Every structure is written in C-alpha cells, then in structure tokens.
Amino acid sequence: MKFIDWIKPGIKLKRWIMLGGMGVLFISFALAELITKGSYYNVYYKAFYIFLIVVGAFILYISLTQGMKSIISLINKGYLNVSLDSRKLGNLIYEKRLLVKGPKIVAIGGGTGLSTMLRGLKYYTSNITAVVTVADDGGGSGALREDLGILPPGDIRNCILALSDTEPLMEDLLQYRFKDGRLKNQSFGNLFLAAMDGISTNFEEAVHKMSSVLAVTGKVLPVTLDNVVLKAKLKNGVVVEGESNIPEQAILYESPIEKIFIEPENARALHETVQAIKEADAVILGPGSLFTSVIPNLLVKDIGNALLKTKALKLYVSNIMTQPGETDNFSVSDHVNAITKHVGGKVVDYTLVNNGTVSEKLKKKYFEKTSELVKIDKNELDKIGVGIVEGNFIKIKDGFVRHDSDEIAKILVETIMDKKLFYDRKKIIEYFYLSQRLKENRKLEKENRGN
C-alpha cells in the first residue's frame, strides 16, 4: 500500500503518524547525542537525553496504540470486514470511513422499486435509513400476516437483502420460494423474519436482529408497528379495502383512485424514523407503486409532518411506466400532485424522471396491459415549483421494464451533492470523495462497454 493512502483526509491516521514521527525524532536525537558525545557529558546531561528517549518511546507507544484503535474500531463496529474481498486494507479503511460519514439518506417506499434503488445507493453511503410500508396483504406476506398476526415481512426482507453484505448463496436461500405443500409460494426469508419476530419483543427488534445477522449497510425500519389496513375511495364513491385489492377493483369498476387512507388513522411512526428524517441530508420517495407503496407511508402519523418540517433535500423518483388500476394516464406532475394532496403540503423539491425509451415491441406489450411510459410534463412541474432531474434509468429484465439500480443511484448522489452537500462546508471531504467515486464508476462503465 502506498504511503499516500494512509494520509488521506478522513482516515484518522495522519495525526498518529505525525505523532509517531515526533517520537522517533526524539529517540534518534537522544541516541545520537549519547553515542557521539556521551563521554563528554556529565550525569545530568546523560539523564536528560535518557529522559528524551523515554518520552519518545512513550509518544511512539501512544501513536501506535491509538492508530491501531482507529483501525480496530471500524472492524468492531462492523464497518470494516477485511475478509470480504481481496482489496488492500488501507483502501478498505478509507472507503469505509467515508461511507460512514457519507450523506444521510432516508428512502421511503416499498415493493421492488425501493429495494432496487437501495442496491445502488449502498455503494456511496452507509447512512441509509429505509422506511418500508407494512400495508401488504397479498402473497406470502399476506398469508403470514393472517396466520401469525405479524406485520408483512416481504418488502422489509427485500430491503434488508438489498442493503446486506452477504454471500450470493445466502441471498438465494433467503429469496427461495417453496414449490409444493402448505408452504407453496412462501419465501424462506419471510419465514426467517417471522421466526426472528417470535424470539423478539416486537417486530422492530426482529428487523434489527435480522439486519445484524446479514451485515446490513444502514438501517431498515417498518414505517409503523401498528397493524394497518390500507383503504381507497374510488371516484365512483366505492371504498376498497386491502392493498392487493385496490388496483383490481379500480380496474373492475373502471374508476380511478380518488383518495387513499389507512386504519387505524392514528398509527404512529417509530421515533427513530422521525429523527432520521429530521437529520437527513436527503429524503427520497419511491420508486414504487404510488398509491399502495409510497403514499401509505406518508399517511402514518408524524411522517408527513416530519417531511414538511425537515431541511433535507426532498426527491421523488417517478415510476417509468404507468400502473393499471393506480396511475392510468398519469404524468409526472400527476404523481407529485397526488403526494402533495395526501400529505397536505409540498414535500417534493426535485423529481427524477426517465427520459429513456423502450423498443416498439415492448411498448406494444405494455400497451396491451393498458400501461405506457409516464409523460414528462415540464410546464406543469414548473408551475408547482418542482425541479426536474432527467436520466435514462431503464433496465430490461426478464422482458419487463425496471429501474437500473446503478444508474439511478449515481444520478441521486450527483443531485444530492449538487443541491445539498456543495453548500455544506462540513461535508467537503464527503463531497470530493463522492465525486471521485462517481468518476471511477463512470470509467468502469465505459471499460465494460468497450469489452
């Protein structure tokens, strides 16, 4: 490892290196004097130089022990695991030290979109708090919710895995779904979290324990510990109950969603979540189903108020495609207006929108399911005072349009740097570190494309 790597700002070793150098200087000077001129000195001079050697040795001891403590503290806190890969120790320390000091980001949502985004963000900061919806009542999560009375674990499991630092085999195991018997279509990860809930005092503790086992970067929190039920009032006046039923009934009645609400309406947010929003550099809403994954979180008591009061940069990641039964014919401004309406005030400063396109074949496939690319209506967004950040976020996976986790993370980090960190002098080290990291990732991308 190069010497320059040890003296980079933020690694907290430079001070001990300098102190150690001072100790070596004291010892060297005293020894040189005693060896070359010792016979000419009386006992008092000799005692002085011996004293210098003792002081130098003490200083050297302090510098070595404190320097090692600085390294070991990273390992003990779980920020550094030298066995994870073959990168050099100094580079790992520098990277982990700055990730710990990276921008404080709160990501609010649920479903596949949120976990996809988290996979990209964890490479830029470890100060991530993922706030996840607990209104899911379908699939394996719904079955466990009904049978065991626990909060739905599916979305939380996906976010934990997205932020975890585990072997691929462990991730495959936790994502495995049983194919037969009474557990058919049930995820092992859901069962793992349900078992963890059984040995914990509450669901929040169970999530913390699972996060600890899987070495999660940041935190994953349920938006509330209350057993909430999601309801929707359609424009025709019909009230639909259940997250999984809402889009289906909207399609059946051919009536769009007018309003979303939760019961109990006084469900309380975790104090830790509210505090994270208050202290955040940026709060990200989405991506995810607007009415069933994003907005339900904002209806929980204290979350909406915290968003209105926070000084954090507030970003909304718009969906790429409209969703049948939820956002039919919606433009980007329609998404933002729906959020504003339900919170009761403006909570979006900038919205990230996709300007990429898909093949005609894929457009036709989605059109047959009454879905299309979300329209970017810049004029309407200007009218409501919401900035636009554009990028090509499309990634085709298994024939479906998905967000590209790496690309969306880069754009988000660049936006946070330019709109928030650039004006905060205390974050200057993180700003330059993130700039360097982004450049490295861009360079790596070009090399991969060239190959």
Swiss-Prot record:
What Gene Ontology terms for biological process does this UniProt record contain?
A: regulation of cell shape
Subcellular localization is given as: Cytoplasm
| Molecular function in Gene Ontology | LPPG:FO 2-phospho-L-lactate transferase activity
GO cellular component terms, semicolon-separated: cytoplasm
Give one Pfam family, short name only.
Answer: CofD
**Keywords for the protein's UniProt record, in alphabetical order:** Cytoplasm
Organism superkingdom: Bacteria
Coiled-coil regions in this chain?
Answer: none
Task of the protein: Required for morphogenesis under gluconeogenic growth conditions.
Recorded family membership: Belongs to the gluconeogenesis factor family.
> Which protein is depicted?
Putative gluconeogenesis factor
Task: Give the organism, scientific name.
Answer: Clostridium acetobutylicum (strain ATCC 824 / DSM 792 / JCM 1419 / IAM 19013 / LMG 5710 / NBRC 13948 / NRRL B-527 / VKM B-1787 / 2291 / W)
